Structures are given as C-alpha cells and as structure tokens.
Amino acid sequence: ITNYDEIKEIINKQSKIDILVNNAGNNIPEHFTKVKTKNMEYLVKINTVATFNLAQLCALRMIKAKNRKKIGGAIVNMSSQMGHVGGPIRSVYNMNKWGLEGLTKGMSLDLAKYNIRVNTVCPTFVVTPMTKKFLKNKKFKRETLNNIPLGRFAELSEIASSVVFLASDAASMITGT
C-alpha cells in the first residue's frame, strides 16, 4: 500500500472504479516523549500518505471513466474516534486520524463537482487481528472499555454496515462526514 508506483499500476489497470474503501492503517502505541522517529515515519506513511495517494489515484480514475452518463463514485476513509477525541499513548495515531478528518473534508469539497462523495467512518475500538495484541493487557482492556459509553468493543460487522451505507446510493447526498 505504500509503494506508489505499484498502486498506480494496479489502479490504472481497472476499467472503472466506483467505490474506494480506504482501510489500511496501523498503530504503535508509544508515549509522546518516547515516540521513535522510525515508528512515526512508518505510521504517517501508512495512515496518511498511502491513504492520500490511493484516494487521489482512485478519484482520478473515477473522473476519467468513460461510457458513463455522469461521473460519480464514493470514497470511504476509515478513521477513528481518535480523530475526534484523541487518547493517551497514541500521539502519532491521533495525529494521523485528525489529519484524515481534514483530508476527507477537503476531498469532499474538491470532488463534489464530479459527484464523488467522500466520507469517513470513525469507529471506537474494534476487535481485529491488529488490536487483539493490545487487549492481552488487562489494564489496557479495562481502561479502554471504561472510556466507551456503550461499554463494549465494536464488532467488524457493525463497522462494515456503516461503510456499505456510505458507499451506497442510500447515502447519495452525504459527503464530507
């Protein structure tokens, strides 16, 4: 996902692109004062730069699509509640997700004239293969659950439903969220 030339080649081989779900991301929890530069650069490259590049390449393909009555499409960026509220030992992740919120707002304005909608899904903590390792720490798990108003972790199916809705015609007037 971070190799621009490879991604560009893959995108350009597609006959058309209607939907992009930008869901690549990672997190390396570190206290702000202990963030290693290599970790920060890695996270920015995956969470921000790769997201930007993939969205731009797909938007260009959507705009250039032939044999369409109208240009259009949907881009759904996967963000996080950390893009709104932040959290300890996640300074770089918070920064990436706040940046993704700004990127989505700007993209939605720039791409609206092409009928391309751009939105984010900002879930709470979701149990995934990536997050399972964090949940092994009982203190972390307890503190995380205490900060989720519903008192439970999100299920992948709950997040997928939001993505499907935003990518569908049912959300045809929703952009910039």
Task: Name these PLM-found stretches.
Residues 7, 31-32, 36-41, 144:
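Substrate-binding pocket helix/loop in short-chain dehydrogenase/reductase
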Residues 24-28:
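Conserved NAD(P)H cofactor-binding loop of Rossmann-fold oxidoreductase domains
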Residues 33, 85-92, 113-114, 151, ...:
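Active-site loop immediately N-terminal to the catalytic Tyr-X3-Lys motif
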Residues 55, 96, 104:
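Active-site helix of classical SDR
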Residues 60, 109-113, 172:
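Alpha-helical segment proximal to the catalytic Tyr-Lys
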Residues 80:
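Residue(s) in the substrate-gating loop at a strand-loop-helix junction
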Residues 116, 152-177:
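C-terminal substrate-recognition "lid" of short-chain dehydrogenase/reductases
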